[in-house]
């Protein structure tokens, strides 16, 4: 049995009122959701990459803890300590600053395991986020999953 039903949905786009079909509405919704998902994924990717960058600096500090403490103790100022860490270990300003703000308890063996676990998890998540950005099908799958979640609620 085939049913056709008229649907008139007037809306304003670019200061011009238009009447569109349900197919056009769904298409515009999907296009909008693609933009939202890509923007969200890029944001999450940038956030994760920043965190990985800091964790890599922590790892260098843990691997060279005695020398890091010596550099910090011998420095006359925070800036001197930061510059010396950057020069000695090839760190950038963000990593050096993070190491200087690091509480000593974060350098214990248990914390080292936590940092390595977080680093591994973030690297896996970064790989997944890059895969989403590289595949329109993955973006469409996310839209589908999110719509199914809404339906279940």
Label the predicted regions.
Residues 1-153:
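C-terminal interaction appendages of subunits in large macromolecular complexes
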């Amino acid at each position: 049995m085939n049913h056709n039903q008229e649907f008139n949905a007037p809306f304003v786009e670019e200061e011009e009122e238009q009447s569109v079909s349900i197919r056009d509405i769904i298409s515009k919704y999907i296009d909008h959701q693609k933009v939202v998902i890509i923007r969200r994924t890029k944001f999450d990717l940038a956030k994760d990459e920043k965190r990985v960058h800091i964790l890599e600096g922590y790892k260098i500090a843990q691997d060279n803890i005695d020398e890091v403490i010596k550099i910090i103790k011998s420095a006359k100022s925070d800036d001197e300590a930061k510059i010396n860490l950057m020069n000695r270990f090839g760190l950038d300003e963000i990593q050096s600053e993070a190491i200087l703000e690091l509480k000593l308890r974060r350098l214990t063996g248990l914390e080292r395991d936590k940092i390595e676990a977080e680093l591994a998890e973030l690297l896996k998540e970064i790989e997944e986020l890059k895969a989403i950005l590289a595949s329109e099908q993955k973006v469409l799958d996310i839209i589908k999953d999110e719509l199914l979640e809404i339906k279940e609620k």
